[in-house]
């Protein structure tokens, strides 16, 4: 399901409004009634002659890293006509409360859980985002939306102006609304820090889904417009660092891995201990067959695609992933 919205409207009304939007590919998923954290499905499209992978990513509300990692053998700028392009859409929701906004930094993705009205079924809406680059990390932790601004002006801090000046690209003290404003047409101010962090749009959609900002959360223009319309001031926001996510679905253990980032926002090597801890926690007291080599390979590939790495012992095809049977992994 795909869509667009407005502040105090019921969820169903919001979804219907989004479905008729000019570009309606923001992903809207009904939350599973059984509490499962897995939503969505993967799909694919054929590229047109004039397409780039970034064009396709924008069209289907995917980020830059997201689409290139899912299509490692496709040229980013010249995929060619008729090339099969995977659209990664199956996701394991980040752990924690399913409320407000959750931004998972390693995933370069934002999740919004609007409050359902009456008997409406709860949904999650998800968008790709850019986050802070090296030395300009996006802060982790709990915060909230404290203001919403249409047509924002940008007041680049002195540190940013200095950086641009050193690169031969001096900035004015104020950049007013318009096509040259990197904040785009909509911004939501967070309480984090001293209020300097925003969720905002962009005048450079090609860079959405990367680590390129000065700490803000950047979205496609259409996506931030849709989110701006439905998120009230006071909405809770959690910024998390969850490069490894696991979940049980139908007796299968899924692993989703993204390149981890450290406290400074830099990409670091995958941590096998984190993988082991996540899998052990998911197993609990249950008996399962785990394919540890496949789990480690999935961690190293870090392509963000949920992969079956284990089968519950009581599932009929428990031997499917040719695993080592046991919750313990002696080679960890």
Regions found by a protein language model. Give the residues of each.
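Bacterial N-terminal signal peptides that target proteins for export
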Residues: 2-12
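Gly/Pro-biased beta-strand-loop elements
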Residues: 91-203, 226-229, 257-331
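C-terminal soluble interaction/assembly domains
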Residues: 213, 224-232, 239-251, 258-270
């Amino acid at each position: 399901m795909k869509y667009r919205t407005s502040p105090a409207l019921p969820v169903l009304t919001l979804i219907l409004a989004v479905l008729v939007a000019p570009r309606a590919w923001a992903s809207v998923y009904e939350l599973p009634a059984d509490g499962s954290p897995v939503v969505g499905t993967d799909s694919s499209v054929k590229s047109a002659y004039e397409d780039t992978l970034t064009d396709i990513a924008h069209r289907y509300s995917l980020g830059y890293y997201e689409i290139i990692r899912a299509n490692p053998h496709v040229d980013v700028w010249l995929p060619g006509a008729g090339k099969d392009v995977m659209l990664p859409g199956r996701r394991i929701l980040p752990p924690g409360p399913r409320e407000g906004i959750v931004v998972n930094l390693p995933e370069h993705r934002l999740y919004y859980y609007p409050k359902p009205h009456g008997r409406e079924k709860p949904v999650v809406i998800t968008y790709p985002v850019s986050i802070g680059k090296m030395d300009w990390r996006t802060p982790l932790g709990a915060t909230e939306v404290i203001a919403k601004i249409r047509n924002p002006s940008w007041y680049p801090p002195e540190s940013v102006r200095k950086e641009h000046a050193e690169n031969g690209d001096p900035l004015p003290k104020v950049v007013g609304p318009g096509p040259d404003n990197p904040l785009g047409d909509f911004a939501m101010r967070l309480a984090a820090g001293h209020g300097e962090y925003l969720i905002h749009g962009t005048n450079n959609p090609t860079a959405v889904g990367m680590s390129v900002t000065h700490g803000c959360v950047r979205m496609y223009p259409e996506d931030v417009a849709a989110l701006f319309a439905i998120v009230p001031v006071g909405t809770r926001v959690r910024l998390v660092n969850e490069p490894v996510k696991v979940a049980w679905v139908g007796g299968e253990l899924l692993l989703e891995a993204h390149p981890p980032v450290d406290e400074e926002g830099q990409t670091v090597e995958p941590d096998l201990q984190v993988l082991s801890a996540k899998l052990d926690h998911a197993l609990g007291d249950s008996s399962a067959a785990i394919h540890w080599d496949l789990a480690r390979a999935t961690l190293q590939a870090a392509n963000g695609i949920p992969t079956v790495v284990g089968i519950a012992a009581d599932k009929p095809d428990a031997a499917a992933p040719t695993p080592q049977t046991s919750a313990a992994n002696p080679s960890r």
